[in-house]
């Protein structure tokens, strides 16, 4: 019995979504990794289609974390601000290169008094989205601490990082250009991919989350292929080891009959 919701038609990815800015991207490839494409075509993705990948969204109070998630998951925008208490999450189902894939988006509180509660949910993230307000330079400066807190509970070498500027609709072109310059530098220092979005208008929101889903999926498949490759190598070593032992055992046996 399949208890998972079916994949919506607008959540199907047949190609790799492109980055916003090449100078601050996790990678600039135009297509999925060839090994990933091949594995999907041959249905060698292991347990990837059954896993739920955890994505945490962190950042200062009122930078627009909840609005960002709601715009993508529910296609809504609520102008009446309500602070997140503790944590909340949404589940999104995708189909990437014909393989089902699920993201669990964790919306964490930005208030200091809930920080301790929220941080307990950071562990096990495969992607971290650090959100700041494009109209508030202090919120950009604070992203470094938010990232440091999140990485205390995760392996920095195995998590994907995204730096997202929100409320782009409130910036003039001149204001945005200045903030983007600083944000790109921060993203490069973090080794994060940079995006700028507007939850009010929906600008870049869909493209951003598709990019998150695609890169997280790609990382999962590559990890699965590495595991399966290691298992195959291990099996060969064990077989060869057993063969050697059998040979040594046989050579030590005395003949049971006379020549």
From Swiss-Prot:
<feature type="modified residue" description="N-acetylmethionine">
    <location>
        <position position="1"/>
    </location>
</feature>
<feature type="binding site">
    <location>
        <position position="66"/>
    </location>
    <ligand>
        <name>Mg(2+)</name>
    </ligand>
</feature>
<dbReference type="GO" id="GO:0005813">
    <property type="term" value="C:centrosome"/>
</dbReference>
<feature type="binding site">
    <location>
        <position position="167"/>
    </location>
    <ligand>
        <name>GTP</name>
    </ligand>
</feature>
<feature type="binding site">
    <location>
        <position position="198"/>
    </location>
    <ligand>
        <name>GTP</name>
    </ligand>
</feature>
<keyword id="KW-0007">Acetylation</keyword>
<keyword id="KW-0342">GTP-binding</keyword>
<dbReference type="GO" id="GO:0045335">
    <property type="term" value="C:phagocytic vesicle"/>
</dbReference>
<dbReference type="GO" id="GO:0045880">
    <property type="term" value="P:positive regulation of smoothened signaling pathway"/>
</dbReference>
<dbReference type="GO" id="GO:0043001">
    <property type="term" value="P:Golgi to plasma membrane protein transport"/>
</dbReference>
<keyword id="KW-0547">Nucleotide-binding</keyword>
<dbReference type="InterPro" id="IPR027417">
    <property type="entry name" value="P-loop_NTPase"/>
</dbReference>
<dbReference type="GO" id="GO:0090382">
    <property type="term" value="P:phagosome maturation"/>
</dbReference>
<feature type="lipid moiety-binding region" description="S-geranylgeranyl cysteine">
    <location>
        <position position="258"/>
    </location>
</feature>
<comment type="subunit">
    <text>Interacts with RILP. The GTP-bound form interacts with REP15.</text>
</comment>
<feature type="binding site">
    <location>
        <position position="107"/>
    </location>
    <ligand>
        <name>Mg(2+)</name>
    </ligand>
</feature>
<dbReference type="GO" id="GO:0005795">
    <property type="term" value="C:Golgi stack"/>
</dbReference>
<keyword id="KW-0597">Phosphoprotein</keyword>
<dbReference type="GO" id="GO:0005794">
    <property type="term" value="C:Golgi apparatus"/>
</dbReference>
<keyword id="KW-0460">Magnesium</keyword>
<feature type="modified residue" description="Phosphoserine">
    <location>
        <position position="241"/>
    </location>
</feature>
<comment type="function">
    <text>The small GTPases Rab are key regulators of intracellular membrane trafficking, from the formation of transport vesicles to their fusion with membranes. Rabs cycle between an inactive GDP-bound form and an active GTP-bound form that is able to recruit to membranes different sets of downstream effectors directly responsible for vesicle formation, movement, tethering and fusion. RAB34 transports protein involved in the redistribution of lysosomes to the peri-Golgi region. Plays a role in the maturation of phagosomes that engulf pathogens, such as S.aureus and M.tuberculosis.</text>
</comment>
<keyword id="KW-1186">Ciliopathy</keyword>
<feature type="binding site">
    <location>
        <position position="81"/>
    </location>
    <ligand>
        <name>GTP</name>
    </ligand>
</feature>
<keyword id="KW-0963">Cytoplasm</keyword>
<keyword id="KW-0968">Cytoplasmic vesicle</keyword>
<feature type="binding site">
    <location>
        <position position="84"/>
    </location>
    <ligand>
        <name>Mg(2+)</name>
    </ligand>
</feature>
<feature type="binding site">
    <location>
        <position position="62"/>
    </location>
    <ligand>
        <name>GTP</name>
    </ligand>
</feature>
<dbReference type="GO" id="GO:0061824">
    <property type="term" value="P:cytosolic ciliogenesis"/>
</dbReference>
<keyword id="KW-0378">Hydrolase</keyword>
<keyword id="KW-0472">Membrane</keyword>
<feature type="binding site">
    <location>
        <position position="84"/>
    </location>
    <ligand>
        <name>GTP</name>
    </ligand>
</feature>
<dbReference type="InterPro" id="IPR050227">
    <property type="entry name" value="Rab"/>
</dbReference>
<feature type="binding site">
    <location>
        <position position="78"/>
    </location>
    <ligand>
        <name>GTP</name>
    </ligand>
</feature>
<keyword id="KW-0225">Disease variant</keyword>
<protein>
    <recommendedName>
        <fullName>Ras-related protein Rab-34</fullName>
        <ecNumber>3.6.5.2</ecNumber>
    </recommendedName>
</protein>
<dbReference type="InterPro" id="IPR005225">
    <property type="entry name" value="Small_GTP-bd"/>
</dbReference>
<keyword id="KW-0333">Golgi apparatus</keyword>
<dbReference type="GO" id="GO:0005525">
    <property type="term" value="F:GTP binding"/>
</dbReference>
<keyword id="KW-0479">Metal-binding</keyword>
<keyword id="KW-0966">Cell projection</keyword>
<feature type="binding site">
    <location>
        <position position="65"/>
    </location>
    <ligand>
        <name>GTP</name>
    </ligand>
</feature>
């Amino acid at each position: 019995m399949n208890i998972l919701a079916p994949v919506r038609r607008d959540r199907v990815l047949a190609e790799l979504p492109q980055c916003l800015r090449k100078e601050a991207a996790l990678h600039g490839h135009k297509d999925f990794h060839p090994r990933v494409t091949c594995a999907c075509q041959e249905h060698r993705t292991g347990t990837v289609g059954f896993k739920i990948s955890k994505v945490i969204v962190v950042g200062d109070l009122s930078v627009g974390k909840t609005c960002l998630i709601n715009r993508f998951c529910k296609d809504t925008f609520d102008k009446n601000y309500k602070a997140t208490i503790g944590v909340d999450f949404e589940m999104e189902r995708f189909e990437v290169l014909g393989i089902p894939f699920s993201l669990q988006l964790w919306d964490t509180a930005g208030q200091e008094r809930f920080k301790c509660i929220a941080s307990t949910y950071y562990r096990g993230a495969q992607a971290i989205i650090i959100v700041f307000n494009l109209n508030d330079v202090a919120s950009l400066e604070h992203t470094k601490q938010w990232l440091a807190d999140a990485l205390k509970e995760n392996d920095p070498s195995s998590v994907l990082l995204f730096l997202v500027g929100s409320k782009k609709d409130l910036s003039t072109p001149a204001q945005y250009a200045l903030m983007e310059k600083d944000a790109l530098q921060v993203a490069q220092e973090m080794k994060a991919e940079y995006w700028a979005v507007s939850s009010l208008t929906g600008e870049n929101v869909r493209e951003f989350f598709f990019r998150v889903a695609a890169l997280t999926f790609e990382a999962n498949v590559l990890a699965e292929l590495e595991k399966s490759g290691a298992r195959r190598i291990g099996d060969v070593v064990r077989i060869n080891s057993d063969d050697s032992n059998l040979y040594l055992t046989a050579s030590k046996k005395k003949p049971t009959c006379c020549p």
